[in-house]
Each structure stands twice: as structure tokens, then as C-alpha cells.
């Protein structure tokens, strides 16, 4: 196999003398192209078809070389619709892989898989481009220190902390606050870490992508008046795109994130929604290329494809890429090869609960189902670990007692269990938090809570020092001092009403 030399040299796209071939065969989004002897393109090279169709409309299709078939023929996958293409049309080898714009000029903009802006705001003013196929950072460049990535969100930082440069799976259905949580994380990384975010919509519904863009503009994550002050770049490959585009859009987003990490030396947050669609697109392409399917009809190269994407998401000595990936689980089967392969790469899982959302507790992160490999005494320290374990024990006991409470009522519980229930309800409410990006909807100012403050707050609840405060005082507040202040306000309101 001829591999592309540009993929091993980050940021370099050396273009040789461009050779031209002819389309030999078209099967859906897959093209077979014949080149002159000795002029074959490398694997992953971008090919361009520029012509006119029978209605004299301009055709501009970019493809990526996937296989060398022999007899001077290559098989390529199109990144856009192949409508209007015909056998015999001229195909130009660009001599390099797909390259996309990178840097500060990408912030606040929406791109497609080719790095072309699709937001009708004109061309991108960026001279720097990176090829989307790049090697993972060398082992000696990696930052192997285990450090917590503080998000300022109490429930995440205490019970399922994120690893700096780690990978987090975000599990949640429709309407439980996934988008708001994503936007808050984008906002907090910009304010607390001076970082930026890249959002990769892989197999997204176009409507959802549009809604996210509009909500980001409303909340100030994207600054319309001064686009350079935006905190996020968006890359979309929607559901209606050919499988080639959906398979590569994740790499486009990752390439933009790598520039911020390696060149700007920033902490970057990379969102991929949905990582399952990346696998699904790879499965479609694999079948189109004639590969024998593997387990459950997935591509035989499933682990390799997932690994090549995930290994590039890492912390180096220059900066970090922390990735949050929405994971769709087909038919709720966690043993399905797609989610099972993803789980092998995750450091933490954040599970959003419809039950908590229906109670009005936001963020609706399930404190018992969410997990993290970082929650170990040697990493987070004994104080943090013990507080988190006691919080989980209290909530678990409350969960066990709920059936008894529903049938017999609170009065039938022992004194100790009644105290556990009261504290668990306070903990549940204290895990809620007003978000900066939701200020326009709630009217409450957003709160960023430092990890030390979070631990102190839960320790005070568990110790019983705050047993006298009403549970409403803990709902939608930042640190524990605000809960005490809110309790005094509630008491004064009750007195004035009497």
C-alpha cells in the first residue's frame, strides 16, 4: 500500500506535480479512477472532479483515495453527492490529503468536512491549513501526569471528574439538558482555562445543528458582533451527507482542535456528537469498498478506525484536548460492537437522567450511574474521594428507601433513616446549579464552583451542621454559603407572609 508521506509530518502538505485521471466507474458515492502509469495518487490523497453536467451546471466534487485496485486504477469515496458525474470525466490528483483551515479565524464559524464555511458569512481569513490525516502525538510528547480537569460544575467535579486530556462519554436522551451542559462546558473552559472548543456534529440532524448554533448565539458562546471573541468552532456533517463526509467530519474537527493545542498551546474541549454515527458511516463505506463485514455487520476495521481517531485526542506537554463524546447505544445494547469499542477508550461517563430532569434538577446528571476512572484516592486525594463515596452511599440508601416511603410514608422510617433521607434530599438539590448559558431563561446568574468549595459544601451537609436549613435553600445555588444566605431569605419571606 502506498501511504501518504504528508500524514507523518503534521501541518505539512507537500503538493507534487498534479496528475489527472479519468472516471472509470461510479457506484453511488464510490468512484473508480484510472490514472496514467506511474502517476497513481497516494492513499488518502484528495481528488477533485471539476466539470459541467448535462444541464451545464458546475460540478465540484472532492473525493478521497481509499484503495489501489491495480492496473493503474484507484477507488475513491466522494465527500459530497455524485449527481451529474459521468464516466470519462477528468479527475485531478491534488497531491495531498484533504486540508482544512485552522486557527483563531475558525472560531464562531460553521464548516463542512472540507473546511468550507457554510454559514453565509463569507470566506475564512486563515492562511494556515492542516491535513486531516495526521499521526498521533509521539509517546515522548505525551503528558502522562494524571490531573483533574475542573469544569466548575459541582456534580461532575465531585462524583465523576474529567481527566485533563481524557475522553468522556455523554449519555442522554432528548430533552434532558445535553445541549445546555455542552454549552456550559464550552463557556467554562473559555473563562476558567482560557481555552477554546471545537464541536463536531457527526451524522447530526440539520435541525439540531441549527438549534445549537442559534442557542450559542443567544448565550454569547458565539459573539455575533465580534466573531473573533467567540469560544467555539463548529464542524457539521449532517445525516443527509454521503457516508464519506460523515466518516471524515470527526477528523476535520479534531484537526482544528489539534492546532489550538499544538500551536496556540491551549486547553481544548472537543465535542463529538455522535461518535456512533462515525462508526456507522465507516460501516457504510466499508461495504461500498467491498470489504467483508465483521460482527453484527460492522466493518472489519472498526477497532483500527476508532483507535486512529481516539489516539489523536491526548494531552501533550504543549496543551490538552479533552473530548466529550455523545454515545448512542443501539437498542440499548451495551454489548453492540460500536458502543463496546467506544467504552474501551473512555475515562469517564456522564449519564443524564430523565427522572432528575422531571424533578427540575439541572444539570440532570445521574450521580449514581456516572463513573470516572479518576475517582481514586491517589489521584484526587483522600478528602475528595471519601466525600464522594459518602455522598453516593447517602443517595443510594435514599434510593433503596423510596419504595418504603411510597407505600408506608416517612413516619414509618427509623430516626437514622429519616435523617439520611433529609440529607439525601439536600444533597440532590445541592447537586443542581445555575448555569451561565441558561441565565437568559432562568433569570438566575450562573455560578462557577471551584472543586475545594464543592467538597466543603458536601462535607457540611454530611456532617449534619446544616440539618436545620430547609431543603429549598440548597436548590439552584453555587457554593454552600449561598445556601445559608438563601435559607435566611426564605425565612424572612415566610415571616413577612404570616
UniProtKB/Swiss-Prot annotation:
GO molecular function annotation: ATP binding; ATP hydrolysis activity; proton-transporting ATP synthase activity, rotational mechanism
GO cellular component: chloroplast thylakoid membrane; mitochondrion; proton-transporting ATP synthase complex
SUPFAM superfamilies for this protein: C-terminal domain of alpha and beta subunits of F1 ATP synthase, N-terminal domain of alpha and beta subunits of F1 ATP synthase, P-loop containing nucleoside triphosphate hydrolases
EC number per UniProt: 7.1.2.2
Subcellular location: Plastid, Chloroplast thylakoid membrane
Biased composition (Polar residues): 1-14
InterPro entries xrefs: AAA+_ATPase, ATP-synt_VA_C, ATP_synth_F1_bsu, ATPase_a/bsu_AS, ATPase_alpha/beta_chains, ATPase_F1/V1/A1_a/bsu_N, ATPase_F1/V1/A1_a/bsu_N_sf, ATPase_F1/V1/A1_a/bsu_nucl-bd
Catalytic activity entry: ATP + H2O + 4 H(+)(in) = ADP + phosphate + 5 H(+)(out)
Gene Ontology process terms (BP): proton motive force-driven mitochondrial ATP synthesis
Region annotated Disordered, chain positions: 1-20
Topology relative to the membrane: Peripheral membrane protein
Phosphoprotein recorded as keyword: no
Primary localization class, coarse: plastid
Any one Pfam family match given in the protein's UniProt record, by short name: ATP-synt_VA_C
Residues holding ATP: 172-179
UniProt function note: Produces ATP from ADP in the presence of a proton gradient across the membrane. The catalytic sites are hosted primarily by the beta subunits.
Family, per entry: Belongs to the ATPase alpha/beta chains family.
NCBIfam families: atpD
Subunit structure: F-type ATPases have 2 components, CF(1) - the catalytic core - and CF(0) - the membrane proton channel. CF(1) has five subunits: alpha(3), beta(3), gamma(1), delta(1), epsilon(1). CF(0) has four main subunits: a(1), b(1), b'(1) and c(9-12).
Entry protein name: ATP synthase subunit beta, chloroplastic
Organism annotation: Hordeum vulgare (Barley)
Lineage, uppermost ranks: Eukaryota, Viridiplantae, Streptophyta, Embryophyta, Tracheophyta
Amino acid at each position: 500500500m502506498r501511504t501518504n508521506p504528508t500524514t507523518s509530518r503534521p501541518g505539512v502538505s507537500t503538493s507534487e506535480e498534479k496528475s489527472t485521471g479519468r472516471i472509470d466507474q461510479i457506484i453511488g458515492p464510490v468512484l473508480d479512477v484510472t490514472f496514467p502509469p506511474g502517476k497513481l495518487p497516494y492513499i488518502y490523497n484528495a481528488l477533485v472532479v471539476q466539470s459541467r453536467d448535462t444541464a451545464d451546471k458546475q460540478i465540484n466534487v472532492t473525493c478521497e483515495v481509499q484503495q489501489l485496485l491495480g492496473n493503474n486504477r484507484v477507488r475513491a469515496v466522494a465527500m459530497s453527492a455524485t449527481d451529474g458525474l459521468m464516466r470519462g470525466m477528468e479527475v485531478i490528483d491534488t497531491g495531498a490529503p484533504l486540508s482544512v483551515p485552522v486557527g483563531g479565524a475558525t472560531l464562531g464559524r460553521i464548516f463542512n468536512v472540507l473546511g468550507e464555511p457554510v454559514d453565509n458569512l463569507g470566506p475564512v481569513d486563515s492562511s494556515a491549513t492542516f491535513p486531516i490525516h495526521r499521526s498521533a502525538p509521539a509517546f515522548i510528547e505525551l503528558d502522562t501526569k494524571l490531573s483533574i480537569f475542573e469544569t466548575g460544575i459541582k456534580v461532575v467535579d465531585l462524583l465523576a471528574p474529567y481527566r485533563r486530556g481524557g475522553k468522556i462519554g455523554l449519555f442522554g436522551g432528548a430533552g434532558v439538558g445535553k445541549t445546555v451542559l455542552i454549552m456550559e462546558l464550552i463557556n467554562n473552559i473559555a473563562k476558567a482555562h482560557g481555552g477554546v472548543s471545537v464541536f463536531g456534529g457527526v451524522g447530526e440532524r440539520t435541525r439540531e445543528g441549527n438549534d445549537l448554533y442559534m442557542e450559542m448565539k443567544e448565550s454569547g458562546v458565539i459573539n455575533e458582533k465580534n466573531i473573533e471573541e467567540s469560544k467555539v468552532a463548529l464542524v457539521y456533517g449532517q445525516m443527509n451527507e454521503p457516508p464519506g463526509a460523515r466518516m471524515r467530519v470527526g477528523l476535520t474537527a479534531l484537526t482544528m482542535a489539534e492546532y489550538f493545542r499544538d500551536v496556540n498551546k491551549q486547553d481544548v474541549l472537543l465535542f463529538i456528537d455522535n461518535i456512533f454515527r462515525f462508526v456507522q458511516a465507516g460501516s457504510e463505506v466499508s461495504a461500498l469498498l467491498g470489504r467483508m463485514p465483521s460482527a453484527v455487520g460492522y466493518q472489519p476495521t472498526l477497532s483500527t478506525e476508532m483507535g486512529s481517531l481516539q489516539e489523536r485526542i491526548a494531552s501533550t506537554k504543549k496543551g490538552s484536548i479533552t473530548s466529550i463524546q455523545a454515545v448512542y447505544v443501539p437498542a440499548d445494547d451495551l454489548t453492540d460492537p460500536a458502543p463496546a469499542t467506544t467504552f474501551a477508550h473512555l475515562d469517564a461517563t456522564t449519564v443524564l437522567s430523565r427522572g432528575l430532569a422531571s424533578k427540575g434538577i439541572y444539570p440532570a446528571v445521574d450521580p449514581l450511574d456516572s463513573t470516572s476512572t479518576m475517582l481514586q484516592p491517589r489521584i484526587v486525594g483522600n478528602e475528595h474521594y471519601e466525600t464522594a463515596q459518602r455522598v453516593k452511599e447517602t443517595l443510594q440508601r435514599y434510593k433503596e428507601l423510596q419504595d418504603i416511603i411510597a407505600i408506608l410514608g416517612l413516619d414509618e422510617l427509623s430516626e437514622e433513616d429519616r435523617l439520611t433521607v433529609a440529607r439525601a434530599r439536600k444533597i440532590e438539590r445541592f447537586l443542581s446549579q445555575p448555569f451561565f448559558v441558561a441565565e437568559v431563561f432562568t433569570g438566575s446568574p450562573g455560578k462557577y464552583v471551584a472543586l475545594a468549595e464543592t467538597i466543603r459544601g458536601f462535607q457540611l451537609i454530611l456532617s449534619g451542621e446544616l440539618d436545620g436549613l430547609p431543603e429549598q435553600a440548597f436548590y439552584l445555588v453555587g457554593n454552600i454559603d449561598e445556601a445559608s444566605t438563601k435559607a435566611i431569605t426564605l425565612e424572612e419571606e415566610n415571616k413577612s407572609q404570616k
